[in-house]
């Protein structure tokens, strides 16, 4: 008989509503048993909205310390990830924590150290989802090197532009606030996470960023608030495998071509579509065409089921473990 896994939720924001709660509810022998939010009233309202008969609280430590909870899903802003993750692991709970991993690399290192002190517990970060279908195929082509169709990958250019800050009077978002988001900048961390899957870790980098929209309206207070997190960022990185990566991210520029990444190999060029998670390939001297994903390599969103499977089977976490999370947080140090 399969033992029921009892989940406690901390944070009732967008991803918890759209992803974590409904996906956990699909898994047999998994129960949501407790919810904590910034107030008991908001936690109770969330439970009522989704017809959940669970314990509610405005204190996350009541959920973390509950003997009725086996695993914790942390859906808060990054400013609480280190605190709640370490507390949950020390309380003997498995942890699924929202991305970005932490406020900075130091906090991420603390989280990794705590997870290593509790090897019997699963520690997982919600992964970057944009390349779920393609990453295994890309990694295979990169790893094959000269023996494969792409050859040796020497350069990668990745561009993520959306122009959301071009709207008149853009409103303050938590990602604009250093006290909530830490060193995280736009989609840089999530993009680095994907690049690391494909190519391996970053060895060194140089970067230049600027904040063009330096004030935004805080709709809670009605006041204009200073913004220090860049809304335009360019990074030139070198990976441990020798490849050079050029990042271009901006929320004050609209794309003239589709967002995505281009991998330039010695035998051809591979293009990954950010919006579609599809691939196209142009052999050297040839014409471009769709490139199929490898057989048995295409998976959609299965974050919660992967988490539960790791708890039940003790399978190692692939997407995304704390070591890989620390690697992408380390890439923020020099920016």
Where do the PLM segments sit?
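Beta-strand-loop-alpha-helix segment that lines the small-molecule cofactor/substrate pocket
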Residues: 70-78, 82-130, 334
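Active-site loop of classical SDR/Rossmann-like NAD(P)-dependent oxidoreductases
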Residues: 15, 38, 272, 294-305, ...
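C-terminal helix-rich "cap/oligomerization" subdomain common to oxidoreductases
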Residues: 4, 30, 71-73, 109, ...
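Contiguous beta-strand/loop segments that form the cofactor/metal-binding neighborhood of enzyme cores
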Residues: 186-278, 305-316
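N-terminal Rossmann-like dinucleotide-binding module
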Residues: 1-51
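Conserved SAM-binding strand-loop segment of SAM-dependent methyltransferases
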Residues: 53-59
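Core-facing hydrophobic residues within beta-strands of well-ordered domains
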Residues: 30-32, 69, 153, 202
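Predominantly a Rossmann-like dinucleotide-binding segment in NAD(P)-dependent oxidoreductases
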Residues: 121, 129-225, 314
């Amino acid at each position: 008989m399969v033992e029921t896994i009892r989940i406690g939720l901390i944070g009732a924001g967008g991803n918890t509503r759209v992803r974590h709660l409904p996906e956990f509810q699909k898994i047999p022998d998994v129960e949501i048993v407790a919810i904590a939010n910034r107030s008991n009233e908001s936690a109770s309202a969330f439970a009522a909205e989704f017809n959940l008969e669970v314990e509610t609280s405005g204190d996350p430590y009541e959920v973390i310390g509950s003997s009725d909870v086996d695993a914790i899903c942390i859906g808060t802003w990054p400013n609480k990830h280190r605190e709640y993750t370490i507390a949950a692991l020390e309380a003997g709970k498995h942890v699924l924590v929202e991305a970005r991993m932490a406020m900075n690399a130091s906090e991420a290192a603390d989280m990794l150290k705590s997870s290593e002190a509790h090897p019997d517990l699963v520690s997982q970060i919600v992964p970057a989802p944009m390349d779920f279908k393609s990453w295994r195929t890309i990694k295979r082509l990169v790893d094959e090197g000269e023996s494969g169709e792409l050859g040796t990958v020497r350069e990668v250019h990745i561009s993520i532009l959306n122009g959301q800050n071009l709207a008149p009077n853009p409103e303050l978002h938590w990602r604009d606030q250093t006290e909530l988001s830490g060193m995280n900048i736009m989609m840089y961390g999530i993009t680095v996470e994907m690049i690391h899957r494909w190519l391996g870790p970053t060895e060194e980098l140089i970067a230049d960023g600027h904040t063009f929209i330096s004030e935004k309206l805080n709709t809670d207070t009605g006041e204009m608030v200073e913004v220090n997190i860049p809304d335009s960022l360019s990074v030139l990185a070198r990976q441990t495998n020798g490849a050079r990566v050029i990042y271009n991210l901006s929320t004050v520029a609209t794309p003239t071509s589709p967002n995505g990444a281009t991998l330039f190999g010695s035998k051809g060029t591979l293009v990954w579509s950010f919006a579609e998670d599809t691939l196209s390939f142009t052999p050297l001297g040839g014409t471009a065409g769709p490139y199929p994903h490898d057989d048995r390599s295409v998976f959609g969103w299965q974050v919660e089921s992967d988490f539960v499977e790791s708890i039940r089977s003790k399978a190692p976490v692939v997407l995304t473990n704390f070591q890989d999370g620390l690697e992408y947080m380390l890439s923020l140090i020099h920016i």
